[in-house]
Amino acid sequence: MHMSFSILNKTKGLSEKLFRLLPYILALLLWAALSIYGQYYLKKVEDLSLFLFDSLYLKEAAQTPGGLLGAMGSFLTQFLYYPWLGALIWTIVLLSVYQLTIKAFDIPKRLMSLAVIPAALLVIANMSLGYGVYIMREPDHFFAPSLGYLAALIPHFTFRHVRSLWGRILFLTIWTAAGYPVLGMFAFLGTVSASLTALTQPGSLRKERFTLFASGIILVLV
């Protein structure tokens, strides 16, 4: 009987380890598939993208909300000229999305698979365009959403160090005002998601949670 329980525990431990490794195995398979079967698509995305090492290009990008994020996405898109390298960079970004989602939202081990959802949606959004890639007006579409999502997690990590209500409201105000010109809608995403998460945080007064949530929504609407 004791031996049976020991075998069951070992099997359970092994399955848990394999489950934790599954996202990394999927990432490796994604990189291999893109490098081998997605070469033409990745090269076409790079061919339709534009990035210039020029101050005028950056100034024009800065005039549009989220333009600098787009410029950063366009910069990384250049690496798709070598499909294996561009796919590797994107895979690393997606793994960062997975890992930081777990940490930002304090996802428990039994629900860690949920952290794959944002990365999976980013993959679907990029790889389901088909011929639509020829009519896309955003040459930065391949990398910019992933980078924007990562940036939108910053308020979550900041809230861990800023505990006071007014300190958090001040941070959200600065974040929204300074982040919107650089990140565009992803600055709003960070504000709203952090405000929503604050509603579920234990150890704080209900009035404070709703005040913070309302402040975040008002900042986005204003």
Residue ranges and their predicted role:
Residues 101-112, 161-166, 199-210:
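Membrane-interface helix-boundary motifs at transmembrane edges
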Residues 161-201, 216-221:
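Transmembrane helices and adjacent periplasmic/lumenal helix-loop junctions
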Residues 31-35, 117-128, 173-184, 215-222:
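Aromatic-anchored segments of alpha-helical transmembrane domains
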Residues 44, 62, 66, 110-165, ...:
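Membrane-interface micro-motifs in multi-pass membrane enzymes
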Residues 31-88, 93:
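Membrane-interface coil-to-helix junctions
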Residues 19-43, 218-221:
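Transmembrane signal-anchor helices characteristic of membrane glycosylation enzymes that use polyprenol
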Residues 1-31:
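Start-transfer (signal-anchor) and selected internal transmembrane alpha helices
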Residues 91-108, 151-158:
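Transmembrane-helix motifs of polytopic, lipid-linked glycan transferases
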